A protein has these predicted regions:
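Short, well-ordered beta-strand elements within core beta-sheets of diverse protein domains
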Residues: 26-33, 48-54, 139-140, 253-256, ...
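Structural signal for hydrophobic packing residues in well-ordered secondary-structure cores
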Residues: 49, 53, 68-75, 79, ...
Length: 478
């Protein structure tokens, strides 16, 4: 843990272990924060807030830019930590660090974009303004699956806006998340501006509620499952704390009858199997027009069935270990249910270990669990449809709404389809897994609310205030 510029253990000395999902080897040992530790972290951030909020934008920008460079220099450390704690491939870890550094650089660019507005007033001699100010302490709760990207995203824009931060790391990758805070400390961030807590899994709910309930915490951002996101939203509502939630997904990729199949195959191979499918934007439903289904599925099978798989600690792979045996069990259940109800196995299959091969199931229907449930693993459903209208209806047949993709050589047609998809994000002729630091990233419906990047991020992590200046006398009401 890191509080008030110092590394520290839990106040009662408690710790918890994270073990490698593949062989059970000890990956990290981290402090198990107490409620007193949670309060101390918030108090440290609150004490540092006035000075940080008042800091000039040039100094804030330079610290964020320096932090981006330091993060990049930690690439090998992040790669080793992610492989040990979550089974992530070197490729995925490097991508995480690269994008995280860009998020930090984009945050540095935001410091001079926090502007306001002069509003015409009905009152004679009155200057009426809308201004944005830092909100206060921001609690960021980051997940394990893209730990560097999402850990940095939880704090970069809030810091750029003049807030101080408490980052609550994931119980599944405490060492990985701690490297982010070490990088910011090395970059020169003042004590208390960034604080970091780790907690035992059984204590997560109590720790989060303790911090959300603290009057100093003015914003909460959370990235994780829809189930846990609902719990976080309930806690935030109880204490009237605004939140930004990026939750689960069931991303559809629509392969229309005029699609460039080779391009679609490459995009879906990445979108479906990056980090073994353990990405909120991961392509979960491959919706393909019946007229091109056979050719497309054959090409996709050939592409993904040869993806390298293995232990990322010892070899270069695309598919490393999934995060735990619960993922294996869940995916095996979904495969079994689909096959029992008429689906056809294209490649892959059930797994006995956390090294799971890329699996495609054809002829999936709404009668199967995998049509509706997020796999969050390398098991993907192919749904055949007979028209553009049916493809859109199939894509929208879910409560989730994070990412989507449409493949067509006719861009006007693809745009028409994209406008009818109920998702916060849609990519035409590109993978569902995409992110850029400056974009308004976020979902709708059961995939959450609010946005992280660009102007939307500024709006989320500042208070909008109305202020007036009366420069004449007289005109008394009474």
């Amino acid at each position: 843990m890191f509080v008030s510029g110092q590394n520290r253990g839990a106040s009662n000395g408690a710790t918890f272990e994270r073990r490698n999902p593949l062989d059970g080897e000890l990956a990290s040992l981290a402090p198990a924060a107490t409620l007193e530790d949670a309060t101390a972290a918030v108090q440290a951030a609150s004490s540092a807030f006035p000075a940080w909020a008042a800091l000039g934008v040039r100094e804030r920008r330079m610290l964020l830019l320096t932090a981006a460079d330091v993060l990049k220099s930690y690439t090998s450390d992040f790669t080793a930590a992610m492989a040990a704690e979550t089974g992530a491939s070197n490729q995925w870890a490097s991508f995480n660090v690269e994008l995280a550094a860009e998020i930090m650089r984009e945050a540095a660019a935001l410091v001079t974009r926090i502007d306001g507005q002069v509003i015409p007033s009905d009152t004679h001699g009155c200057l009426s303004m809308a201004i944005r100010q830092p909100a206060g302490v921001v609690l960021g709760i980051a997940p394990w699956n893209a730990p560097v990207i999402l850990g940095v995203r939880a704090l970069a824009t809030p810091l750029a806006c003049g807030n101080t931060v408490v980052l609550k790391g994931s119980e599944l990758c405490p060492a990985t998340h701690s490297l982010i805070v070490q990088a910011l400390h090395q970059a020169g961030f003042p004590a208390g501006v960034v604080n970091f807590l780790t907690n035992a899994p059984s204590d997560a709910g109590a720790i989060v509620e303790k911090m959300v309930a603290d009057p100093a915490v003015r914003r909460v951002n959370f990235t994780g499952s829809t189930h846990v996101g609902r719990l976080v939203a309930q806690i935030c509502a109880r204490y009237l704390k605004p939140s930004v939630l990026e939750l689960g997904g069931k991303a559809p990729a629509l392969i229309l009858d005029d699609a460039d199949l080779d391009n679609a195959v490459e995009a879906i191979a990445f979108g479906a199997f990056a980090n073994s499918g353990q990405v909120c934007m991961s392509t979960e439903r491959i919706i393909v027009d019946e007229s091109i289904a056979q050719s497309f599925i054959a090409k996709l099978r050939d592409r993904v069935s040869t993806l390298p798989i293995g232990d990322p600690r010892h070899e270069t792979v695309v598919l490393g270990s999934v995060v735990d045996n619960a993922t294996v069990y869940r995916c095996n259940e979904l495969i079994s249910d689909a096959l029992d109800n008429g689906a056809k196995l294209v490649c892959g299959g059930m797994s006995e270990t956390t090294l799971m091969q890329a699996t495609l199931l054809d002829r999936v229907t709404p009668a199967m669990r995998i049509f509706h449930e997020e796999t969050f693993g390398p098991v993907k459903a192919i749904v055949r449809v007979n028209s553009e209208k049916a493809a859109i209806a199939c894509a929208n047949d879910t409560k989730m709404g994070l990412s989507s993709a449409v493949f067509s050589r006719d861009v006007a047609r693809a745009l028409r389809v994209a406008r009818r998809l109920r998702t916060g994000i849609c990519h035409i002729n590109g993978p569902t897994v995409q992110d850029e630091a400056q974009v308004p990233f976020g979902g709708i419906n059961d995939s959450g609310w609010g946005h992280f990047g660009g102007q939307a991020g500024i709006d989320a992590f500042t208070d909008l205030r109305w202020m007036t200046v009366k420069n004449t006398t007289g005109d008394n009401v009474f």
